[in-house]
Design a protein with these regions (language model features):
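Binuclear metal-dependent phosphoesterase catalytic core
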Residues: 182-266, 304-336
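Extended active-site neighborhood of metal-dependent phosphoesterases/phosphodiesterases
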Residues: 33-126, 145-166, 172-214, 218-221
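Short, surface-exposed loop motifs enriched in S/T, G, D/E and P with embedded aromatic residues
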Residues: 268-281, 300
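Active-site glycine-centered loops adjacent to acidic/histidine catalytic or metal-binding residues
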Residues: 26-27, 55-56, 135, 168-169
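Short beta-strand edge segments in extracellular beta-sheet folds
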Residues: 338-343
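Single conserved hydrophobic/aromatic residue that forms the stacking wall/gate
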Residues: 1-21
Length: 343
């Protein structure tokens, strides 16, 4: 049972008693409603408030209306949409799964929730910060940045406010500005890829997004389980990534367009690295090893190409390369590699 492992306690270590809370972004029991009571008991013992978001796998497979399919979830965790405040930030939880039974569903926010959210928005002071947590993402970046129609209406209702969507569902990690004043944080899985694989299928380490508010300022950073908070990048030597055999390749999994990723060769600044889209080399090697062992690979285990990779081609005489990534908040992360070594 996942929450009886150290994972939840590692996430929450240092948070208890420090004005913190956890938001679980859905698919809490993965089509196993008999686990709701046990999961709720584990949440209750964690020492911080835990706010639930309903996912498509939290619906009752034996029901054929959305209302009936969410009854078991609501019995254990309460309403599927609600709001709460922390600090100066207003948090709204929504259900953006319209369930039709037998695992068939639409990713939309129903009219009742949209009206409720719009009425909530009207009561907020101008320029408020609002975080909307829901399961499916508002925008699908891999489908030409297609935005959910009901999310467009939601953004219109919160125009004039600082709006953040916090979402899950995709098993990917990304931070995108959808429109002026609106950012979506689509968070990777804390369990790797569906508990089967040690990292997510886009190459993001298993972990969680940590949002902070301090003195009214709002920031975020990704925390990889079992790693120092300072570990935010992964660098490969030339020859380790087949698509870029002569290049140093860096992965920056919490990247957004406000980051800078630069490189140094033997201490000399060489400028910005080139962003590219790749299947993650580590994840691909993991899947290849499973195939070699005769394991059948499901479609949700296939590597997912992602655009948070960066390349630079060092000179033939270079002895060392350092990659430095700086996030939008000015935090600096670096990794050095000695050329000629592949360990």
């Amino acid at each position: 049972f996942f929450f009886k492992q150290k994972t939840a306690y590692e996430i929450l270590s240092g948070l208890v008693g420090s004005n913190q809370a956890a938001i679980v972004l859905g698919d809490i029991v993965w089509d196993s409603p008999e686990l709701f009571a046990g999961v709720k008991a584990e949440f209750a013992g964690l020492g911080v408030p835990v706010y639930g978001v309903i996912g498509n796998h939290d619906h009752d497979l034996n029901k054929y209306t959305d209302r009936e399919a969410t009854e078991n979830y609501r019995r254990h965790f309460g309403p599927t949409y609600y709001a709460f405040d922390m600090g100066r930030t207003h948090y709204i939880v929504l259900d953006d799964i319209v369930y039709h039974g037998a695992k068939k569903y639409e990713e939309q926010i129903d009219t009742m929730q949209l009206r409720w959210a719009a009425a909530y928005a009207e009561r907020l002071p101008a320029g408020s910060r609002v975080c909307i947590a829901m399961h499916a993402p508002a925008m699908k970046s891999w489908l030409g940045n297609r935005v959910m129609e009901s999310a467009e209406r939601l953004m219109d209702a919160f125009a004039g406010h600082e709006l953040h969507f916090i979402t899950g569902h995709t098993h990917l990690n990304s931070n995108y500005d959808i429109r002026e004043g609106v950012t979506e944080h689509n968070v990777a899985q804390v369990c790797g890829n569906l508990w089967w694989d040690p990292i997510n299928w886009d190459g993001t380490p298993k972990g969680f997004q940590l949002f902070r508010e301090c003195g009214g300022e709002f920031s975020w950073e990704y925390r990889s389980l079992g790693e120092s908070p300072a570990r935010q990048i992964r660098v490969w030597h030339p020859g380790q990534v087949a698509k870029h055999p002569a290049s140093v390749v860096a992965k920056v999994w919490n990247w957004d367009s406000y980051w800078t990723v630069v490189w140094y060769e033997d201490g000399r600044y060489r400028g910005a690295m080139q962003r590219t889209t790749l299947d993650d080399p580590d994840y691909t090697a993991h899947i290849d090893s499973l195939k070699a062992a005769g394991r059948k690979i499901s479609k949700v285990q296939r590597p997912r190409p992602t655009n948070f990779y960066f390349t630079a081609r060092p000179s033939a005489s270079a002895r060392e390369v350092e990659v430095v990534a700086t996030d939008r908040f000015g935090r600096r992360y670096s990794e050095r590699i000695a050329l000629g070594h592949t360990d």
